[in-house]
Amino acid sequence: MSKLLPIKVWGQGGPNPPRVAIILEELGLPYEFMPIQLSQVKEPEYLAINPNGRLPAIYDPNTDLTLWESGAIVEYLVERYDTAHDISFPRDTNDAQHARQWLFFQASGQGPYYGQACWFKKYHPEPVPSALERYIKEMNRVSGVVDGYLAKQPVPPGGDGPWLVGNKCSFADLAWVSWQMTLKKIIQTEDGYDVENFPHLKNWLDRMVAREPVKKVLSAVMPPPS
């Protein structure tokens, strides 16, 4: 990996960019953050990189590839660089398909519902209780799916699971971390969501945030209160 050129990354904070940085750290890939403010994402210079005007995006000079959408970036990084399958699985195996399934569920379930709940709690110009209630119900539903699934997964002797796929921590698990940590700063128990109601999910998250690559990324963008 030492011969690789640094991958350029636009976006560092927020719920989605850390997902990419976590994978880069887990794989030991060189990368550099490109300075950009949220006020600049709709400007022509950045729209030429990501026409959707959102963060993150990457440019990999090793393959001359520009890519946006965090889930697509995660898939690319593990398919291209995780040849030892440290956090992924061999192509054409059931585990590889199941990992993709959970990544897509994160992108279609956790991301949109958690995002809308946070929007209506913190950013919407006026309170809309029915909207907040709807999205928090969906947060509870999605968390229940993950919690119930983890509860049924066997842990082999000496294992550190349970995990979503293949008895190891993979990109399918790691993709969920940053939104869950963002949520802690915005949604409170009185809003109707408490991670303590999902003990298997909470334990799973605790195990992931204890990993050194995850700690490094989160400490940079979500420092603990002093």
Swiss-Prot record:
One of its GO terms (molecular function) is transferase activity. Residues 92-226 form the GST C-terminal domain. Keywords: Transferase. InterPro entries: Glutathione-S-Trfase_C-like (IPR010987), Glutathione-S-Trfase_C_sf (IPR036282), Glutathione_S-Trfase (IPR040079), Glutathione_S-Trfase_N (IPR004045), GST_C (IPR004046), Thioredoxin-like_sf (IPR036249). Residues 4-85 form the GST N-terminal domain. Pathway: Secondary metabolite biosynthesis. This is Glutathione S-transferase-like protein gedE. It comes from Aspergillus terreus (strain NIH 2624 / FGSC A1156).
